Every structure is written in C-alpha cells, then in structure tokens.
Amino acid sequence: MKVLVIGNGGREHALAWKAAQSPLVETVFVAPGNAGTALEPTLQNVAIGVTDIPALLDFAQNEKVDLTIVGPEAPLVKGVVDTFRAAGMKIFGPTAGAAQLEGSKAFTKDFLARHNIPTAEYQNFTEVEPALAYLREKGAPIVIKADGLAAGKGVIVAMTLEEAEAAVHDMLAGNAFGDAGHRIVIEEFLDGEEASFIVMVDGEHVLPMATSQDHKRVGDKDTGPNTGGMGAYSPAPVVTDDVHQRTMERIIWPTVKGMASEGNTYTGFLYAGLMIDKQGNPKVIEFNCRFGDPETQPIMLRMKSDLVELCLAACEGKLDEKTSEWDERASLGVVMAAGGYPGDYRTGDVIHGLPLEEVEDGKVFHAGTKLADDEQVVTSGGRVLCVTALGHTVAEAQKRAYALMTDIHWDDCFCRKDIGWRAIEREQN
C-alpha cells in the first residue's frame, strides 16, 4: 500500500521512517519532507506545502494513496482531515472542529472547565486593562499564553509582575504573535514536573503511546526562553503506573468522551502536556492534536508495533483490537539548533559529519534541513536535527546520543548539554 506523511520536520521524518518499516507498505511519500527524508532510500519527497490542502488531496487521489498521516498542527486546524474524508480518502488525524483543542487555548480551557478536567485556574482576555487588573490581583509567578497557534513558543512563564505586564502588552497591544495573540489566556503557575502523555484515539477507543518528557527551555537546567523543544526522552519515570492510571481516568477518557458529546468526535494522536505535582496528581497544561516534536523521535525509536497497522485500525474504529509494543530500553533525542534560535537565526549553512550509513540503536532525524542544488545538506530552520539513541538507562541513552553527534557540525550550531537530567538524577538516587 501507499502512505502519505504530511510535514517537513523531525517528527515527520520519524513517522515516515517508522511507517516505511511496515510490511504492509510499498511506498511512503512525504510532503514536502526535508533533506533527511530525501536521503532515505525508503521515502520519497513530494514538493507540496503542508497547508496546500487541494494539492495534497489531488496528489493523494492521483497516486491512489491508501493512508495519510498528518504531522503538524497547521493543516489539521485548516481542515485537511475534513477535506480528505469528504473525498473518501483514509486519513489519520482530528477534524478542524476537534483540532480546536490545539488551535485555541481559550477553547481548550473552557472545554476542560465544562468537563471538570484538572487544569490550572485561568481567565481569557482580549483587552489590556482587564488583563493587567487580573495580573495585579493574582501576582507572580503567572503564565500568559497567546490563544492561537504559535509553534510552541506563545507561552510566557513570568516570574515577576513586570515580566507578566510586558507579555500582556506584547500580545494584546503589540503584535508579538500576530493573529495568535489577539486573545490571551492568563493562568496560575503550576509547580511540579512536566510529561508528554500521547495517545492514539479512534473516536471511541484509546491506545496509549510510550510516555516522554520534553525540554522546552533553550538553555541548560531549563533556563532562557521557551522553544518548540530542545530534546526529549522516553519513557518518563515521573509517569508511574499510578500517574498513568490517573491520567487516563481523569484526563484522557473525559476528554475523548467530552469531545464526542459536543459533536467534535476526536480521532488522531492526542498529546496531553501534563504537570504532575508531588502527590502524583496530573493537570493539563496544554493539548496538542498531533504527536509532539521532538518527542516523536525517541518514541518511534522505541516502537516495536507496526505504526501503519495501528493508524489503519484507528481509521476503522478498531483500536480496541490492538496493543502497542515497545523496546524495554530508554531512548533520548537531542536537538541541534541554529545559533540564535528561538530568536533570529541564519539558514543555508552546510552541515558536516552526518553519518553515511544506518547507526545501530541510534538515528539522526532531520528537521530544518534541505538539499542544496549541489546535493549538500544545508540548514533551513531553527531546530535542525534530532540526534537520538537507545540505552538500557536514560543516562546510557544520553551518552550514546551525545557521542553520535560528536562529528556533526555547522557554523554556529548549538544544543543543550543536559537532556534527560531529571530522569538521570532519579536513576542516580
């Protein structure tokens, strides 16, 4: 069968790489893909942008694609799933209505409140003055979020009132996040440890994926501004069996049932960003309506199941007939980024030292890369590569990932040196 993966990041390289391992599959197309997918013998890039929905549908119909898997959020919010389904094409992802869970933070917070799903106390604002009054009433630390899609960067964790007020001005009066920031959510600062809890949903049944933990801040020990994610590992030891059960009972099931009851039946990957307190109680920080990036990369490295088989079962409403199998080992991915990210950065730098053949128990997934006219791999984004490895412990996986990246370099590249530090501290204790 033929599979189409929509997207051009590290997540899509990992999903397409995993899909191509399925015995059911003869061809995997990636639209538009990147240099990593271009260089994979089992994958084929297609030059169509992720939000060019008519062109994506045309291609899928002409090529008789049997299954489409959507990577990024933008086409989901624009209704790619609705369009494909209306044309009778099999596609795994949520409808535009269901994708509001990521497309609007205000929608999500109101939804969580309606269904008594644990989350931070909050209020939505469109005007500066009432927002500032609320800040002064609540005090810092406090969290300010742009309502719409901001590539994972529209969240300011303000440790002082001045910082919080500046963020409100930037978003509502300034134009820090364009349309995404015309409405903001201000919410209480939650203490605890974060985890990424990702499941597959077929509208009614849920199949949990492996747990993971992302590293949002740009600097070591979680300092500096938020990014799309600087690295991740799986599994996340903070998600104990108890926490797993609580998350399913208090968050995932009520969300799936609540969406269905409101006429937005959810199918696709559902990613709950959790904050877990000292007592092991999870609260929702955010929902994403797709797999996380960079969490996908270490999770796919651990996945033993057939991803395509699971997606097909989900499209047919038969996820309850499937289980997922995982490598017992831990896996860890480190993002190599362009200097200046998440602010302004340069593109077009030649990347040296990429491994020429497959690495045992490791993989270099490409994100912001492209093939130049002379076939050299050059940078084309802020997050450029995700260097991922397996190990019997998180510490061993970390050591292997950093070793795998030793020879890879370009002008002004950087990475965090401490990905996995929370899990490694746990292992040492």
UniProtKB/Swiss-Prot annotation:
ATP binds at residues 135-196. Belongs to the GARS family. It catalyses: 5-phospho-beta-D-ribosylamine + glycine + ATP = N(1)-(5-phospho-beta-D-ribosyl)glycinamide + ADP + phosphate + H(+). Pfam families: GARS_A, GARS_C, GARS_N. The keyword ATP-binding applies. Residues 212-237 are annotated as: Disordered. Keywords: ATP-binding, Ligase, Magnesium, Manganese, Metal-binding, Nucleotide-binding, Purine biosynthesis. InterPro entries: ATP-grasp (IPR011761), ATP_grasp_subdomain_1 (IPR013815), PreATP-grasp_dom_sf (IPR016185), PRibGlycinamid_synth_ATP-grasp (IPR020561), PRibGlycinamide_synth (IPR000115), PRibGlycinamide_synth_C-dom (IPR020560), PRibGlycinamide_synth_C_sf (IPR037123), PRibGlycinamide_synth_CS (IPR020559). Its EC number is 6.3.4.13. Residues 213-223 have a biased composition (Basic and acidic residues). GO terms for molecular function: ATP binding; metal ion binding; phosphoribosylamine-glycine ligase activity. SMART domains: GARS_A, GARS_C. Its cofactor is Mg(2+); Mn(2+). This is Phosphoribosylamine--glycine ligase. NCBIfam families: purD. Binds 1 Mg(2+) or Mn(2+) ion per subunit. Residues 109-316 form the ATP-grasp domain. It is an enzyme of class 6 (ligase). The lineage of its organism: Bacteria, Pseudomonadati, Pseudomonadota, Gammaproteobacteria, Enterobacterales.
